[in-house]
Design a protein with these regions (language model features):
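Terminal, non-catalytic protein-protein interaction segments that mediate quaternary/complex assembly
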Residues: 1-177
Length: 177
């Protein structure tokens, strides 16, 4: 990114880039650019599992509300990019598990994180993730994540932790490795 990224708004960007995480359940995440906190990432996961978009819920779980969430919250203290709020919305997760359980070859097992009907809510808090798709290959659950933007230096560490837990949750619920 530093060498090949183009100046785009207030950052550097690369477009149409993909990568594979070979062992997503290994949550020993390191980042030389910042200190990563597994304790905080776990609290964020518990917040997502609560299905509650309120930053106050995160504060209850973690003991404080990180400044980034205060900045992103709407006037009611809700965060629209809370993955738990999004994946459980409209029974999406149940639908995905049902599709995978009934047909391991399904191409319908997808979660929508970004909801176009919520564009007005996204003024200060637009989800970076658009969608998550699940496929089964050799009885193993694979997951593909599609992002509109990826804060590789700061956000990705926590996102990877959350994504691995989403994959683990869906695998357990649908009976795949």
């Amino acid at each position: 990114i530093i060498l090949e990224g183009i100046n785009f708004d207030d950052t550097k960007a690369l477009f149409n880039v993909g990568f594979t995480i070979e062992n997503p359940m290994d949550n020993h995440i390191t980042n030389v650019e910042r200190e990563w906190s597994q304790k905080y990432a776990r609290a964020e996961w518990d917040w997502y599992l609560s299905r509650n978009p309120s930053i106050n819920k995160l504060g209850e779980i973690y003991g404080k509300i990180p400044p980034i969430w205060k900045k992103m919250a709407d006037e009611d203290g809700h965060v629209n990019s809370n993955y738990g709020y999004q994946i459980f919305r409209d029974n999406q997760l149940h639908y995905v598990v049902e599709k995978l359980t009934n047909n391991p070859n399904t191409r319908h097992a997808a979660l929508s994180i970004y909801d176009g009907k919520e564009n007005e809510k996204y003024a200060t808090d637009t989800p970076c993730t658009y969608a998550i798709q699940f496929t089964v290959l050799d009885n193993r659950l694979n997951m593909s994540v599609y992002l509109r933007s990826n804060d590789l230096w700061y956000g990705f560490c926590n996102d990877q932790y959350q994504f691995s837990h989403i994959q683990e949750l869906v695998a357990k619920m649908s009976g795949y490795d």
